Amino acid sequence: MGKLTLLLLTLLVWLQYSLWFGKNGIHDYSRVNDDVAAQQATNAKLKARNDQLFAEIDDLNGGQEAIEERARNELSMTKPGETFYRLVPDASKRAQAAGQTNR
């Protein structure tokens, strides 16, 4: 009976070692779980960005308002009869802002 107990105990130790430290063991499972979580977070960010881009594409395809808004903001374009005003801060405020960014 002692040999059988020793054999079973040895088998148990070997199986536990394989479970904890062997290939596809607990450590590998934990590492893969972390990798999957990181990839899912990245995928969620990219999906949100894609949804935003698709919404912008639909907006640009759907009407002139989005195109007009981009032309006004990016190209400083105006409609006929409109006057474009650009507000420039005082020289003292510009110098103060420049001094803060250089620090």
Swiss-Prot record:
Membrane-spanning segments: 4-21
Entry-linked Gene3D superfamilies: 1.20.5.400
Compartments where found: Cell inner membrane
GO biological process: FtsZ-dependent cytokinesis
Cytoplasmic compartment segments: 1-3
Bilayer topology annotation: Single-pass type II membrane protein
Keywords of this entry: Cell cycle, Cell division, Cell inner membrane, Cell membrane, Coiled coil, Membrane, Transmembrane, Transmembrane helix
Gene Ontology annotations for the cellular component aspect, listed alphabetically: cell division site; cell septum; plasma membrane
Protein name listed in UniProt: Cell division protein FtsB
